[in-house]
């Protein structure tokens, strides 16, 4: 999983533990780990959600000011399925 630079430190501190992604199909697997900086992000849960499930509270929990801000970053390619990825950081 890749994250914008401004999210990496809060993720490493455990302040951000989820991410909303818009993909055609999942790009990560539960239980797998993905390199981020000196450590790894480990995926704890992955589930498809509806676009209307992306609330201002979820956007803030994901490290964004609001839903519009999050959606500008969440879309990757031509996907139209919304996924909530929950994870933890291992340094």
Regions found by a protein language model. Give the residues of each.
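Mixed-charge, low-complexity intrinsically disordered regions
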Residues: 1-91
